Each structure stands twice: as C-alpha cells, then as structure tokens.
C-alpha cells in the first residue's frame, strides 16, 4: 500500500482539513464535488480497461465502490437528522451575538448570493470541462475496445496455428506408431538400439522443452506479480478515493450545519425585530395614555413619571449600549468574515488550481499507465493463451507419451524376454550340440562295439543257419535212414543189422547237436553280458553325471534294462516333467504316462515306470519350479519323494515340504495315478478327463501340472486362498546324500524292505524263467530277447 507521501494533493487535503472545518470554507467544498466526480469517472474508466484485460476482478472492486457510494448517500438523511437535532443547541449559543440591525443582514445576504452566483458559474465551467474530459475518455475507451477486438482476432489466429501444431504433433505420433510397428515386426538388434537411442533423444528434447516452458512460466509468473503490484497500487488509489469521499461527506455535513446555523440566526433576528416593534408600539400607546391623563394627574403622577422616565432612560441607555456593542461585534465579525472570505477564496482558488493541475498530471499519468497496462495485458493475454495452448499440447503429448511409454516398455520387455528366450534356447542348443557330440562319440564307440557284435551275431546267425541246415539235413537223413531201417526191419533176416545201425546213429549225431547248441548259447551269453556291461556303465541318474552345464544325458535307472535320454542340470537334478508352450499333448492314456512321452529338450514326461525306478530306494527329493502368468516364480520342494510300482498304481508318497509355494501336493498324498482311460481319484467326477491330463488326483484341482495348457495348469495357494495360474513348470528329482539316505532308510525300513523285496522278486523270477526257457529252448527263446534289448539300446542312442 502507498502512504500519503506519494500523493501530495491528498497530503495537502489532509493538512487543510482544519481550514475546511470552518463555516466559511464550506462554500468551497461545493466546487470539489465535481472534481471528485471526475476522479470517480476516471477510476471507473481505468477499472473498465483493466477489467477488459483481467476479467471480473476490477469490476467487482468498482461494484464495491458504487455500493459504498450508495451507503454514503443512504447515510446522509441520518446525518441531516442529527444536525437538525443538534441545531437548537448551537443556535442558542449564537443568539448572544445576534444584532437587531437589518442592514447588516441584508448586506451579508447579498454578498452570499453574489458568492453563490460566482460559484455556480465556476461550477458550470467545471462541468463543461468535465464533459469534455469524459468525451475524450469515451473515445479512448472505444479505441481500447477496438484494440481488444484486434487482440481477440489475433488469439483466434493463434488457436488456428495451435490446430496446425496439433496436426503436426498427430503426424509425429503417427510416425512414432509406425516406427513402433516396424520395431515390433523387425528382429534385428541394431534397429532396436537405434530406435531406443532415438526415443532417448526425443525424450531429452522434450525435457529441454519442458524446462524452457517452465522458464517462460516463471517469467509469466513474474509479469503476473508485477500486474498484481499494479492492482495493489490501484487498490491504494481506490482507498485514497474512499478517504477523499469521506472527507467530502464531512465537508458537506459541515456546510449543512453552517447553513442551518445561518437560517436559525435569521429566524432569531426576525423574531427580535418583531419583538422590538411590539415594544415600540406599546411605548407609543403608553405615551398617549400618559399624555391624556397628564393634565389630571400631573401633579400626582409627576413623581411616577419622573421615575418611569428615569427607568426608560436607563433601559434606553442599556439598549443603546447593547446595540452599540452588538453593532461593534457585528462590524468586527463582518470584517473578520470578509478577511476570512478573502483568505478562503485565495486558498480555494489556489488549492483548486493545484488540485486541478495535480489531477490533470495524475490523469495523464494514469492514462499512460492505463495504455501501457492495456498493451502489457494484451501481450500477456496473448502470451497466456499461447502458453495455455502450448501447455495443453504438452499435456496431451505427455499423456500420449505416458500412455505409449508403458506399451513401449511392455514391447521392450517382450523383446527382452524373447531375446532371453532366444539366448536360453541358443545356450540349450549349444548344450544339446555338445551333449549330442558327446553322445555321438559314445554312440560311435557303442556302434563300433555293436558292429563288432553284429559281425559276431552274423557269424552266429550263419552258424545257426548252417547248424539248422545241418540239423535239417541230418534229420532228413535220419528220417530216410529210419524209413530204410523200418523197411529192413520188416524183413526178418535184416532186423539184427538195423538194430546195429540204429544203435550207432544216436551215438554219432548227439555229439554234433550238443556242440552246436553249446557254442550258440555261449556266444549269445557273451553278447548279453557285453550289453549289460554297457548299461551298467551308464549313470543311474543325473547326480552321477559330472557336468558344468545343463544338457541332455543318457542314464540307466536302477532295475532298468534299457537306457534313457533325459535333461540334467549342472547341480545334479534330473528333469522328469517340463511344460512351457503347450507343444506336447498331455491328454494321453495311462500306458503312455507309464512309458513316458515328449522330447527331453522340450515338453515331456519321463514316465511313471522310470520315476518308480529313480525313487525306488526312497532316497530322492522332489523340486517343483513354477512361473505364473505375472512372471512370479514359485518353488515347492519335498525332501522325501517316492513313486510306487505299477502294481500299486504308481502311488504318490511325499514328505518334509519347503518353499514359497503352498503344500498343494499334500492334498494328493497317497493317491494313485489317473489318466483319461483310467480314473483312480476319489472325486465323483473324472478329473483327468475334465482337465485333459494325467495326475495323482484326489479332488481334482489342488495341484495339476499335466493339464491342458492355458487351462488346467494350476497350483492352489492356501495362504491367499486362490489358485496360481501356471505359465511354465518343471519337476526335478535328485538323490539325497548317503547319510540322509541311511537315516531315511532306518526311518522307513519296513516300507523300503517290502518294496525292495517285491522289486527284487520280480527280476529274480524273470531270471529264473529266462534260464529255464533258455535251457529248454536255447535257439528259439534267448536270441529274440537279446535282439530286442540291443534294438532298444540302439533306438535310445538314436533318440
């Protein structure tokens, strides 16, 4: 707020307030009223100009000013009433100085009328001047309105330019989308790197533009602050105007009071004049009465007349002295009034001239400031509109970028995931290549051995064929000889000779047959022992495979007479199940699940029979690795894992759970394996048929990793009471250390002994049957068995 130092006219007004309180200066206040009216009109014009630029802020202030003016005018009758109530007291005080002279009152009234006529003429001139100034202000306001219209048209043109900028931004966004589509379709790393660098550059440029926008916004904020300071200056001017208005109202009140006082003095003087005339009339009547009765009562009333005459003379002297004193006081008052009037006129004209000059200077200054403010406000409005449009465009671009950035991140994450998959597949392919090379080397060795064995088998088969031909030839000879012998036996003289020949023939043929059979059996046993030696040299599981990387390896589980190709990890885990893309069909029969299916490098099931032999001694643990559709990794590990035999339905046995996934397999503890053609669950529905996959079902969906892909791969999370939607899964088996195996064997010795005896009984019975059949028919039974095992080994090596 500005103080009184910045407004010298107002300071003079404040200083001369004591002079204006005088009744003589009240007449000059009538001249100030049109000047203050001009100031009000000027303030209203400034308010209109500033309101055209700044909205309705200043208009509200103008409304407040008009409301205050209404309040002041409404309060005026109350002031008059107060003055009327207070007037009698002041009139009583002024009666002391009233004179009975009519001439002085007439002179003062004539002078007042002359002063009023002069003041009315000056007021008319001032009103004309104010009308001219108002006309000039109206012309300026019209020019300002035309300027505002021009600025609005420019702002509309800027909005059209903003539409073109918006079209450019849309075209750039379309280009970004096309490049994003190209980036999605392309697979080369250089293009992706270049697009990512381009995106980084564009984002950095956008950030720089945002910094520039922030700077311009700060500049605009400074301009707005300056504008607010100008508004504060206008508020100070407005407050000064309010103060002037209050001073004007006070001067009006004082003027009205003086007018009331003068009117009361007039009335009192008239009343005194009437009283004086009545007193003269009474004196004349009394003198007449005294003249008529003077002759009669001259002598008697001479003394009384003398007394009355002396009393009248004393009263007349007193009145003369009082009138003389009043006339002297009135003359002094008139002189003082004339001096005061001269001083007031001089001060008034001087003050009015100074005030008019100051008002004109202030008017010119306000007009210049108004013009500057209007131009600045117009430029600020342009800048504000352009900034708003630019901010809207930037916000739109930012929202679009915010919407496109997650898509880009999603696409980049997809590309990274695809790249990771490709790298993992490449590593797997490399591992598979190295493993294939190793397996090829092993197979080359085994094939060379098999070729040698095949040569031996060919020789053996040739020998067998030769033996068969010899046996057939001998059999035909024996038959012919027997026929001849029978014919000779029919003859009596040749019977003794036939008996001698028949006695010699078995002795000659039996050594040949026995030698051939023994050589054939020995060669076949040699081939079988070599095959079993090759099988025994293979590792029983992946814990015996010493490798530094994950890959495919040949293993031979305990009790199995043919090798098995499976995936092994570097830390000795054997992969028994894998799901990740739904490429393999897991809706298979119970026999297929028992034998196993799929490719070890992709989706596959190792087979329930192989699981039984891998976990036969109850010394294995199971680890289930899962990844849900939100890329969360879940692990469930069981320290004890065992699958029973085929006769028991491959029953599930687990214990000692750990991991971040829930113990969902515990709901299926002790359940037999179910498939689409063999329902062994305890549910009323066919779980394997409904969810299209074999599993150890109890009540269907507590855990199922062999169901239909994207439909039936689930794992129940008891902590959250919801199912995990599994995207990929892997089941791994590993043998426990020897110490833990002994502890588990001692803890479950009975169960292991029973299962072990059953498992041992089956091979022993098979061995006995094999030996008996081999001894009974060595040439027809043993050879096909050996050939089948060799064929199985060769097929496994080729796989």
From Swiss-Prot:
Possesses five pairs of dibasic residues that may be the target of proteolytic processing. Residues 287-316, 489-509 are annotated as: Disordered. It holds the Pfam family Fibrinogen_C. Its main location: other. One of its GO terms (biological process) is imaginal disc-derived wing margin morphogenesis. InterPro entries: Fibrinogen-like_C (IPR036056), Fibrinogen_a/b/g_C_1 (IPR014716), Fibrinogen_a/b/g_C_dom (IPR002181), Fibrinogen_C-term_domain (IPR050373), Fibrinogen_CS (IPR020837). The keyword Signal applies. Keywords: Developmental protein, Differentiation, Disulfide bond, Endosome, Glycoprotein, Neurogenesis, Notch signaling pathway, Signal. Disulfide bonds join 542-568, 687-700. It comes from the Eukaryota. PROSITE patterns: FIBRINOGEN_C_1, FIBRINOGEN_C_2. The keyword Disulfide bond applies. It is found in: Late endosome. One of its GO terms (cellular component) is collagen-containing extracellular matrix. Residues 533-737 form the Fibrinogen C-terminal domain. Glycans are attached at residues 372, 587, 618, 660, 744, 787. Residues 489-498 have a biased composition (Basic residues). Residues 1-51 form the signal peptide. Involved in regulation of neurogenesis. May encode a lateral inhibitor of R8 differentiation. In conjunction with Gp150, promotes Notch activation in response to Delta by regulating acquisition of insensitivity to Delta in a subset of cells. This is Protein scabrous. It comes from Drosophila melanogaster (Fruit fly). The gene is sca.
